From Swiss-Prot:
This is Alkaline ceramidase. Its cofactor is Zn(2+). Residues 1-28, 82-91, 193-205 are lumenal. One of its GO terms (biological process) is abscisic acid-activated signaling pathway. One of its GO terms (cellular component) is nucleus. Zn(2+) binds at H79, H205, H209. One of its GO terms (molecular function) is metal ion binding. It comes from Arabidopsis thaliana. Hydrolyzes only phytoceramide into phytosphingosine and free fatty acid. Does not have reverse activity. Affects plant morphogenesis. Required for the formation of wax layer that ensure cuticle permeability. Implicated in abscisic acid (ABA)-mediated stomatal closure. Involved in both biotic and abiotic stresses. Promotes salt resistance and defenses responses toward pathogenic bacteria (e.g. P.syringae) and against the fungal toxin fumonisin B1 (FB1).
Length: 255
């Protein structure tokens, strides 16, 4: 929320502000809670990346975890500054990331191997160029939701073809986190005037970041399990510190 407090970054130039008082804790951080709430996303992506590298999963999963980290860092920059350029560093990686998910989901059954990655790369590059010059506003949200919806049929197909109970539980956590996170985001956007009058702001957008951090981790872990099944790597779900699920594989000696 805009206010009259002076800041290091100057006037707000982003097209979106969340329901949090600007520069309440520091003249260097516009939205404090919305900034620090991206830390779980970075840590979870780092854990996933280490697991993918240690067990030599396909490079696509390492890139996916790295894209999660880039998105979280871009979001931190955006909410810390509320500048239009930093807003693009948040929104453009969101689209790139979902395009990467589309590749991982659909590529196993795609007969023309070079066609899909080429198209998705050109699409992502074109979007980045256009987005650098145009402020889409609601158009960006609609575009992003459409891309997300295109992933649902394949995610559901993987779910119904997975018999492992632990893997299915991860998929259910994926659905639960995105639903709860979306409710937090919606309330923060729609009921901000009412929330601002409460004694304590629940920081709905910050909660959205936290839930989506776990959502991305669950999605990545579930997809790693499904891909390992396709490759015959005998995947099993294990738990880091007894809480955080990850995929343990046993590759045949020939691989």
């Amino acid at each position: 929320m805009a206010d009259g407090i002076s800041s290091f970054w100057g006037p707000v130039t982003s097209t979106i502000e969340c329901c949090e008082m600007n520069y309440a804790y520091s003249s260097y951080i516009a939205e404090f809670y919305n900034t620090i709430s991206n830390v779980p996303g970075i840590l979870l992506a780092l854990i996933g990346l280490v697991n993918a590298l240690r067990q030599r999963f396909e490079k696509r999963f390492s890139i996916l975890h790295i894209s999660n980290m880039i998105l979280a860092i871009g979001s931190m920059l955006y909410h810390a500054t509320l500048q239009h350029v930093q807003q693009q560093s948040d929104e453009t990686p969101m689209v790139w990331e979902i395009l990467l998910y589309m590749y991982i989901l659909y590529s196993p059954d795609w007969h023309y191997r070079s066609t899909m990655p080429t198209f998705l790369f050109l699409y992502g590059a074109a979007f980045a160029i256009v987005h650098a010059y145009l402020r889409f506003g609601i158009g960006f949200k609609v575009h992003y939701v459409i891309l997300c919806l295109l992933c649902i049929p394949r995610m559901y197909k993987y779910y119904i073809h997975t018999e492992d109970t632990a893997a299915k539980r991860i998929a259910k956590w994926y659905v639960a986190t995105i639903l709860v996170g979306s409710i937090c985001w919606f309330c923060d956007r729609v009921f901000c005037k009412t929330i601002s009058q409460w004694p304590v702001n629940p920081q709905g957008h910050a909660l959205w970041h936290v839930f989506m951090s776990f959502n991305s981790y669950c999605a990545n872990t579930f997809l790693m399990f499904c891909r390992a099944q396709q490759r015959g790597w005998n995947p099993k779900v294990k738990y880091f510190l007894g809480v955080l699920p990850y995929v343990k594989i046993e590759k045949p000696k020939t691989q």
